[in-house]
């Protein structure tokens, strides 16, 4: 796009014509992650001050979607998948396969660019962590989290998410 963009420029700062021109001139890639896994990662990184995962989840639920941190805010409110026609959606845990396809489509040499991913190990680890953390939550918290991330679960195929159950 012909305008100079700074790192801080948000799409909402442009008028509709400029937005359409920009979106039409870029390849749009969206990286997504299961919302429950995002919560676990945020908790493990110490971004909440809660002593337990259950109390952290309660803090998240109490904050609501409008006051939520970007770390756990529902994806649909951050990246607007219904408004922006993304060309590629890359799901966490499938980086090697999906990024390889994306690089190939872009005409770039796949094997020489991609780092070594351990997607299978990551999937197994997060499955185990999800089971452990999910068991700490009350039935009410589980229901509230499913509601909190309802639109993410509807917009993206997180079929193995604990929140989908």
Model-derived segments and spans:
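Membrane-interface amphipathic segments in extracytoplasmic regions
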Residues: 1-165
